[in-house]
């Protein structure tokens, strides 16, 4: 037990006692049930792992290992209550079932959600920040598997720069970016890295790109047989430790004109310290939609492929393994499936939402064989993001995000790709891959029956006392914490709830139960956020986590919390019970 002193006005001080965390009432009850004379033996713990933690394959050896790690040398015969509580709240009791790759990785890459970056070279906003290889390295170290580079002639027209065209961003040399990708592509995952090029080059500079890419990537570069188009994408397993180039077939060079940094529409930057709430894709802002139906990403602009190939250097064309491009015509032409050729299509977030109003099932069918990339609308000049569930629920594999930003949308992205060992590839659920007649194709907006109900008990939290100054949340008293608990998923499953606020407590014990009926648990993410209530100002941020529901471990688990930027706190955790009922 320790004491904290807070100043009140100039003359007075308030003193509060800080006490060590204590096991919640239900934990004590469980311990009594699975112990004898105050000791939980190996057999008791083994039964607890099977009955409560739902670890059907747990062995007595697993139980003994837990006792060895959680007990002192003097108490290796079993766990006392404090040691049992320490184990439950410890790092060896995580919320995700598996921390290794466990999905089937032998299907075509069109069958996977892929961790995708947007304008991966930018250090900040979309209009005036620096371009650098550092954000690319950071993204790769976080498990991102798709890196986007906008390539332009340099000022002398004799080399290639990477920058956000028609803005005031300062360029970085392409060769630096390529070397960074080569050096760090497989730091955290062996699965393939896709480099998408937004090409604004002359044919002679395209030849130079081909030389750079071939020299730097060497034998790890994946290229299809000369003169052949892919009829089906290879699998992640077959492409392990390979780099893939994706862009549209080269077209005639058009030199950029004057800088144009003004975008129409409202900047959709984060509205609060921790980020605006994630919008539902059934509550679309029509006025914003009108401003950016065409987006500002010309990666897949309509192109006359026959004309473009006249001057395109063959060595550059040969680099392109994943062809991108929008066929001439409307969205129905874009979504046509060619049985003899697969390709990548890019749509802005607004284009996707507009298309999904009438063509949701066609989009899902398209993504069963082809790749669909979604990118942020042009008015997101502060590098904010959007609701990724819109793309995922329609089967889009590459939902491109500004990784240098932060906010609730990015938390969903980070949470999604904690699945499958954090390798950057997540097998799409079967419902998105089911083919046949239109009645068999998944409709993201359909009202479906409840498949399961997720019950979440938020017992308590701790760790803020160690990771923050004692006046970080409040100058005059300990913090007043509450937790927001909810689901991000298809519209019918999406909801947020909250606990009561507990005043003046560094170790809040809410002990509240929430139930979430889920119609599509395969696309549901559990959201947990802690905030500190402030009567006069905006509530303070106290940590967050987001996790894929389908990979949650049942039972009582320690949920580590993360900062606004997604960095895990050293000590802050929530003790939560997860049940499917």
Swiss-Prot record:
Tissue localization of expression: Expressed in roots, shoots, leaves and flowers.
Main localization (coarse): membrane
GO cellular component: plasma membrane
Region Disordered, annotated ranges: 279-314
Residues of the PI-PLC X-box domain: 103-248
The keyword Cell membrane appears for this protein: yes
PTM characteristics: Phosphorylation level varies significantly during early response to bacterial elicitor.
Positions of the PI-PLC Y-box domain: 317-433
Residues forming the catalytic site: 118, 164
Protein's cellular compartments: Cell membrane
C2 domain: residues covered: 434-563
Cofactors that this protein relies on: Ca(2+)
MF terms (GO), sorted A to Z: phosphatidylinositol-4,5-bisphosphate phospholipase C activity; phospholipase C activity
Record's catalysed reaction(s): a 1,2-diacyl-sn-glycero-3-phospho-(1D-myo-inositol-4,5-bisphosphate) + H2O = 1D-myo-inositol 1,4,5-trisphosphate + a 1,2-diacyl-sn-glycerol + H(+)
Bilayer topology term: Peripheral membrane protein
CDD domains reported in the protein's UniProt record: C2_PLC_like (cd00275)
Induction: Not induced by environmental stresses such as dehydration, salinity and low temperature.
Biased composition (Acidic residues): 294-305
Keyword entries, A-Z: Cell membrane, Hydrolase, Lipid degradation, Lipid metabolism, Membrane, Phosphoprotein, Transducer
Annotated ranges, domain EF-hand-like: 26-102
GO BP term (any one): defense response to bacterium
EC number(s) given by UniProt: 3.1.4.11
Function statement: The production of the second messenger molecules diacylglycerol (DAG) and inositol 1,4,5-trisphosphate (IP3) is mediated by activated phosphatidylinositol-specific phospholipase C enzymes. At physiological calcium concentration, the preferred substrate is phosphatidylinositol 4,5-bisphosphate versus phosphatidylinositol.
Recorded domain comment: Amino acids 23-36 of the EF-hand-like domain are necessary catalysis but not for binding to lipid vesicles.
Name used for this protein in its record: Phosphoinositide phospholipase C 2
